[in-house]
Amino acid sequence: MSANLKYLSLGILVFQTTSLVLTMRYSRTLKEEGPRYLSSTAVVVAEFLKIMACIFLVYKDSKCSVRTLNRVLHDEILNKPMETLKLAIPSGIYTLQNNLLYVALSNLDAATYQVTYQLKILTTALFSVSMLGKKLGMYQWLSLVILMAGVAFVQWPSDSQELNSKDLSTGSQFVGLMAVLIACFSSGFAGVYFEKILKETKQSVWIRNIQLGFFGSIFGLMGVYVYDGELVSKNGFFQGYNQLTWIVVVLQALGGLVIAAVIKYADNILKGFATSLSIILSTIISYFWLQDFVPTSVFFLGAILVIAATFLYGYDPKPAGNPTKA
């Protein structure tokens, strides 16, 4: 059953990540009259939606009893303040990471951003080894190297992308690069920290997500006030929101739930591989839908390497002797 949940959650993550990349790219490049929606408010709204979804799931687990729901929330959150406070650290880092990625996408071309952001897989592996004591075998370390090479091939910029990158100033490229590098390290640390909390305590993944979303909303609102306070007071919190914006926000909220399930039933490194597969899928779809990418032989080589690395990571050679030895 756990194996089925593992691959089901990974499959949903690939779908969610692919859809989010395509819709977010389209929403940020679509030319419209009036102000564009603020990314800082989108992060906050996504956190609120995630909290609402998790409360509903806890309600469902409580046999649709409001009284049981209130008791569970009171016992697991209010009566365990130290357990709740544990989520403040990863929540703050996740909020910072979400805002950094908007900064990165505003200052880097898509190819450079996506290649560089895959460094989070390596940082996740290193934090998993150091914080969780996870043992990676030779095949798993090799798969990480192959994955990095494959993603680099997949996102190798074409001539048109190189020309577009020249339009970006050196300063903005440096800002974008620093943003995505910090996001890579924060993603690795926060993801492994959250995994450690989930697997060492008995609280459900939905309760943990409510706690995570609570702090995320607070940190997110602080970010809105500091960076976009004037714009919000002038044009409103939901300025620039349209149907596409709400799709992006819902997909972001869904992503938090799916990632939590992946961390619970799989692990952070498999989450990274699923994200890499979604990059290939989103690039292919963008060729047919957005028509802004032409696949090359280098792309197909990279796709093969990423898929091979995914299977290699899951390869578990059985020892010839001492089968009962831990």
UniProtKB/Swiss-Prot annotation:
Matches recorded under InterPro entries: Nuc_sug_transpt
Keyword annotations of the record: Antiport, Golgi apparatus, Membrane, Sugar transport, Transmembrane, Transmembrane helix, Transport
Entry's localization field: Golgi apparatus membrane
UniProt KW Membrane keyword: yes
Post-translational note: O-Glcnacylation regulates the stability of SLC35A3 and the specific complex formation with MGAT4B.
GO biological process, one term: UDP-N-acetylglucosamine transmembrane transport
GO molecular function, one term: UDP-galactose transmembrane transporter activity
The reaction(s) this protein catalyses: UMP(out) + UDP-N-acetyl-alpha-D-glucosamine(in) = UMP(in) + UDP-N-acetyl-alpha-D-glucosamine(out)
Membrane topology type: Multi-pass membrane protein
UniProt GO cellular component terms: Golgi apparatus; Golgi membrane
Transmembrane regions listed in the UniProt entry: 4-24, 38-58, 136-156, 174-194, 212-232, 243-263, 269-289, 293-313
Stated role: Transports diphosphate-N-acetylglucosamine (UDP-GlcNAc) from the cytosol into the lumen of the Golgi apparatus, functioning as an antiporter that exchanges UDP-N-acetyl-alpha-D-glucosamine for UMP. May supply UDP-GlcNAc as substrate for Golgi-resident glycosyltransferases that generate highly branched, multiantennary complex N-glycans and keratan sulfate. However, the exact role of SLC35A3 still needs to be elucidated, it could be a member of a catalytically more efficient multiprotein complex rather than function independently as a single transporter.
Subunit annotation: Interacts with SLC35A2; the interaction is reduced in the presence of SLC35A4. Found in a complex with SLC35A2 and SLC35A4. Interacts with MGAT4B.
Record family assignment: Belongs to the nucleotide-sugar transporter family. SLC35A subfamily.
Protein name: UDP-N-acetylglucosamine transporter
Organism: Rattus norvegicus
Gene: Slc35a3
